[in-house]
């Protein structure tokens, strides 16, 4: 039974000692480029070298004000120093201090048991 789904050149049997690379009708080999696996750092370095001098980098991009506004942490700092958070922290510290007399002079330590 003849397989008609494959192209004519792939129907030829491959001998055990031959290369798996195909030869075209003229007898020259079609070479596949050797692929090397590059790390991300090597690919970035190669890309930087390839585009060096071809990509203009502006001195300013016109949106620096937005960047500075985004980096402003004053709204977050105000939320973290609110009186509610400070009073909650003080209440937790007071709760832990109330039981210290019942346990002795040493505070209770958290015990972590191995699950292995």
Curated annotation (Swiss-Prot):
Residues 1-33, 95-116 are annotated as: Disordered. Its main location: nucleus. Keywords: Nucleus. One of its GO terms (cellular component) is nucleus. It is found in: Nucleus. CDD domains: BIC1_CID (cd22645). It comes from the Eukaryota. GO terms for biological process: blue light signaling pathway. Disruption phenotype: No visible phenotype. Bic1 and bic2 double mutants have a blue light-hypersensitive short-hypocotyl phenotype and an increased anthocyanin accumulation when grown in continuous blue light. Regulates the blue-light dependent dimerization of CRY2 and formation of photobodies. Inhibits CRY phosphorylation. This is Protein BIC2. It comes from Arabidopsis thaliana. The gene is BIC2.
